C-alpha cells in the first residue's frame, strides 16, 4: 500500500523543506507542488553542489521520479524556462519528467509590474512581497479574468484575452500608480515563443495522482513558504497569497484529503521570518545576530536578511492545529551550538497581563504581545554533521524532548547540516 506524505513549513518559511523533500524522494514515484509560485527558493546541497529550485519540484534531481505542478501553483512561463534551462545544462532531462496542470494561472509581466508599483506606493507600510507577481496573479484567478495554461491551446483567443487584461492593468499602472505601461506585443511574443514547450508538458494532475494512489505508489507533496504565511490562517495581512497549509493539497492538486497519510512539519530549531509582520520571539541583540550569522539567514531567492528569534511553541501550536501535523523535522540544530542557554517560548503575555498558550489570528492582535520563555542549558559540543542521535549531547536531547512535550508532536527527523546525508531519521514518514 502506497503512502501519501505532505512536507510543509510549520513556521514562516525558509525551514529547509527542499533538503528534506530531496532526502525522502528516493522513497516515492511522484513529487508534487500544489501552491505558490517561483517566490520560494528551495536550496539543495548534494555532494557539495548547490541547487536552488523555485518552481520545479525538488524531486527533479532524481531520475526515477516524476514531478507534478498542480493547479494551485501560479506559473511564470519565463521563470519556468529559465529554471529548465539551468537544469538541462547540467544534463537533467526536465521535459520528460515534469507534468503541469492546464488549470495553472499564468504569471505575466503585468503582474510583476503591479507588484512593484503597489509595494512602492505603500512605502514603509509595504507587505514585503518578493516582487514576482504572485499576489496579482492569484487576484486574477479569483476575479476570473486570469490567463491559464489551458488558454495557450488557442493562440488567437489567448491574444484577445491578453489584450483585454493588459488594458485593465495598464490603466491602473499609468493612471493610478504613475508607472510605465507593459508592452502588449512584446508580452505576447515572449509567451508565444515558449507556449508549445509548456503545452507539451500538460497533464491531468488529479487523475495521475488518483491512479498512483490506487496503484500503491508513494507520493510526496512539497509545500512552499510556511503555515504561518497562509492567506487564511497566517498573520494577515503579512501573508502570502496561497494556502500553504495541508488543505492546499486538496485544492491545489485535486487530491482527496482523506488520502493524506502523514503531514511532516518542517521547523528550525529556532525561528526566522523574512519581511514584515508579527514575530514575538524576534531577537534584536547580539544573540539574534549570532544566530543569523551562523545560520546564514539570507533568502535563497531575494537575498534579503531574515529576522531571527527563539523557538516559538505557541505559534507552532496553531500550525499543528490547522495542518494535523503528524511529526516534525527539526533543521539547523547545529546553529544553536555554543550558546550558554537556549529558550523556548511557551506562552504569550497579552497587554492585559493575561498569559495565553495560543497565537492570535490577525496581525493587529499581536500588537503588544510579549513572549513567555522557558530557559534551558545550551551545549558547547559541535553537532554539525552528526548522524547518530545517541552521539548528540544530553542538552540537545533535553531540548528536543521539551519541544515534543510543549507541542505534543514527535520529532521524526533531525537535520544537522545542509547536505542530505547530515540527517537522522528517527521515524520514517513513509513507514508510519
From Swiss-Prot:
Pfam families membership: Adenylsucc_synt
Annotated binding of substrate, by residue: 300-306
Enzyme class at the top of the EC tree: ligase
Record-level GO cellular component terms: cytoplasm
Disulfide bond positions: none
InterPro entries, per the entry: Adenylosuccin_syn_GTP-bd, Adenylosuccin_syn_Lys_AS, Adenylosuccinate_synth_dom1, Adenylosuccinate_synth_dom2, Adenylosuccinate_synth_dom3, Adenylosuccinate_synthetase, P-loop_NTPase
Binding positions for IMP per the UniProt entry: 14-17, 39-42, 130, 144, 225, 240, 304
Catalytic site: 14, 42
Cofactor note: Binds 1 Mg(2+) ion per subunit.
GO terms assigned for molecular function: adenylosuccinate synthase activity; GTP binding; magnesium ion binding
GO biological process assignments: 'de novo' AMP biosynthetic process; IMP metabolic process
Amino acids binding Mg(2+): 14, 41
Binding annotation for GTP: 13-19, 41-43, 306, 332-334, 415-417
Presence of the UniProt keyword Magnesium in the record: yes
Subcellular location: Cytoplasm
Subunit note: Homodimer.
Protein name: Adenylosuccinate synthetase
Amino acid at each position: 500500500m502506497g503512502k501519501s506524505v505532505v512536507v510543509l513549513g510549520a513556521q514562516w518559511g525558509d525551514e529547509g523543506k527542499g533538503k528534506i523533500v530531496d532526502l525522502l524522494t528516493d522513497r516515492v514515484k511522484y513529487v508534487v507542488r500544489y501552491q505558490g509560485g517561483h517566490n520560494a527558493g528551495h536550496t539543495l546541497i548534494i555532494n557539495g553542489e548547490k541547487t536552488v529550485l523555485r518552481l520545479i519540484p525538488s524531486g527533479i534531481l532524481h531520475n526515477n521520479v516524476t514531478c507534478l505542478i498542480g493547479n494551485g501553483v501560479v506559473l511564470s512561463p519565463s521563470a519556468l524556462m529559465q529554471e529548465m534551462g539551468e537544469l538541462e545544462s547540467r544534463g537533467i532531462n526536465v521535459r520528460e519528467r515534469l507534468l503541469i496542470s492546464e488549470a495553472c494561472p499564468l504569471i505575466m509581466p503585468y503582474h510583476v509590474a503591479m507588484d512593484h508599483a503597489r509595494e512602492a506606493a505603500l512605502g514603509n507600510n509595504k507587505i514585503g512581497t518578493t516582487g514576482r507577481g504572485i499576489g496579482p496573479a492569484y487576484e486574477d484567478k479569483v476575479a476570473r479574468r486570469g490567463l491559464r495554461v489551458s488558454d495557450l491551446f488557442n493562440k488567437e483567443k489567448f491574444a484577445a484575452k491578453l489584450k483585454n487584461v493588459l488594458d485593465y492593468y495598464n490603466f491602473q499602472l499609468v493612471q493610478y500608480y504613475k508607472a510605465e505601461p507593459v508592452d502588449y506585443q512584446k508580452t505576447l511574443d515572449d509567451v508565444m515563443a515558449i507556449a508549445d514547450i509548456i503545452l507539451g508538458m500538460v497533464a491531468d494532475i488529479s487523475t495521475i495522482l488518483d491512479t498512483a494512489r490506487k496503484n500503491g505508489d508513494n507520493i510526496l507533496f512539497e509545500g512552499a513558504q510556511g503555515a504561518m504565511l497562509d492567506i487564511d490562517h497566517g498573520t494577515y495581512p503579512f501573508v502570502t497569497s496561497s494556502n500553504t497549509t495541508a488543505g492546499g493539497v486538496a485544492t491545489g492538486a485535486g487530491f482527496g484529503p482523506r488520502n493524506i497519510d502523514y503531514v511532516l512539519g518542517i521547523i528550525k530549531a529556532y525561528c526566522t521570518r523574512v519581511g514584515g509582520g508579527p514575530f514575538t520571539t524576534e531577537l534584536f541583540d547580539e544573540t539574534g545576530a549570532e544566530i543569523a550569522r551562523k545560520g546564514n539567514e539570507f533568502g535563497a531567492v531575494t537575498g534579503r536578511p531574515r529576522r531571527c528569534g527563539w523557538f516559538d511553541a505557541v505559534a507552532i501550536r496553531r500550525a499543528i492545529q490547522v495542518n494535523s501535523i503528524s511529526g516534525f523535522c527539526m533543521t539547523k540544530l547545529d546553529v544553536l551550538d555554543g550558546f550558554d542557554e537556549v529558550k523556548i517560548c511557551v506562552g504569550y503575555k497579552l497587554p492585559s497581563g493575561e498569559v495565553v498558550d495560543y497565537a492570535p489570528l490577525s496581525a493587529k492582535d499581536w500588537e503588544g504581545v510579549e513572549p513567555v520563555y522557558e530557559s534551558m542549558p545550551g551545549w558547547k559540543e559541535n553537532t554539525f554533521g552528526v548522524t547518530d542521535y545517541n552521539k548528540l549531547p544530553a542538552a540537545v536531547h533535553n531540548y528536543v524532548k521539551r519541544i515534543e512535550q510543549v507541542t505534543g508532536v514527535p520529532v521524526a527527523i533531525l537535520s544537522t547540516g545542509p547536505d542530505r546525508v547530515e540527517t537522522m531519521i528517527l521515524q520514517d514518514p513513509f513507514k508510519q
